[in-house]
A protein has these predicted regions:
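Mid-bilayer segments of alpha-helical transmembrane spans in multi-pass integral membrane proteins
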Residues: 92, 96, 100, 124-136
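Interfacial aromatic-anchored transmembrane helix boundaries in multi-pass membrane proteins
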Residues: 21-38, 63-99
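Hydrophobic transmembrane alpha-helices
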Residues: 1-57
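Residue-level signature of transmembrane alpha-helical entry/exit and packing/kink sites
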Residues: 4-15, 39-43, 83, 87, ...
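Membrane-interfacial segments
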Residues: 26-30, 34, 72, 76, ...
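Central hydrophobic cores of alpha-helical transmembrane segments
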Residues: 59-69, 119-126
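Internal alpha-helical transmembrane segments of multi-pass membrane proteins
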Residues: 105-132, 186-195
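Alpha-helical transmembrane segments and their cytosolic interface
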Residues: 1-16, 148-195
Length: 195
């Protein structure tokens, strides 16, 4: 039991460092072209982390992404994301929703052969939910302003398309990599015949 907890804590630490580094690189590559920058690598990573393990761990990927986004907002001045209800909460909810979408689709299909396709479909739906949750949180918890309007337009117009495409392609790959590195036998149980 202690070994499992130690493994989980170490895994979360490594993934947090990786997530923050990737998010920072994405931000500084695009900061001169578009604000807020698209998280085209970070979002597939957070979705893959949300599909790691069982439902109790499904909040990990989104929470790590939200915390990294919250910290980075102070570094680069994304004032809209200074509020944790905008930067952390929607990402945590999207991670949990992504797990349950993947779980539900896997239970419906019950076939190993289509798992990669289901993972890609789940990733696409999770990006859609993530965008809706973040924009909804911005609408409810933000004070508005010119930067708010720009952020709203950029997220819908540019970021969503890039993040959606990358999540569909990269999430199944990242899930396989995480599964192999952590020696997890499978992310979700397949539906057994006779159950």
């Amino acid at each position: 039991m202690k070994k499992d907890k130690a493994h989980l804590i170490a895994f979360i630490g490594v993934m947090t460092a990786l997530m923050f580094t990737v998010l920072m690189l994405e931000t500084y590559v695009f900061i001169f072209f578009i604000k807020p920058s698209p998280a085209f690598l970070t979002i597939p990573l957070f979705i893959a982390l949300s599909m790691y393990g069982d439902w109790k761990h499904s909040f990990i990927g989104g929470t790590i992404f939200g915390c990294c986004s919250f910290i980075l907002s102070f570094i680069v001045g994304y004032t809209v994301f200074y509020n944790p209800l905008i930067s952390i909460l929607p990402r945590t909810l999207a991670g949990v929703a992504g797990y349950w979408i993947f779980y539900g689709l896997t239970m419906l299909a019950g076939k190993e052969k289509v798992r990669q396709v289901l993972c890609a479909v789940s990733a696409g739906l999770t990006v859609l939910l993530h965008t809706v949750f973040v924009l909804g949180a911005m609408q409810v918890f933000s004070t508005g302003g010119a930067f708010f309007d720009t952020v709203w337009q950029v997220i819908i117009g540019v970021n969503f398309v890039a993040e959606f495409a990358c999540a569909i392609v990269l999430t199944p790959i990242l899930v396989k990599v995480i599964k192999k590195v952590t020696k997890t036998p499978d992310f979700l149980p397949l539906k057994k015949k006779g159950n």
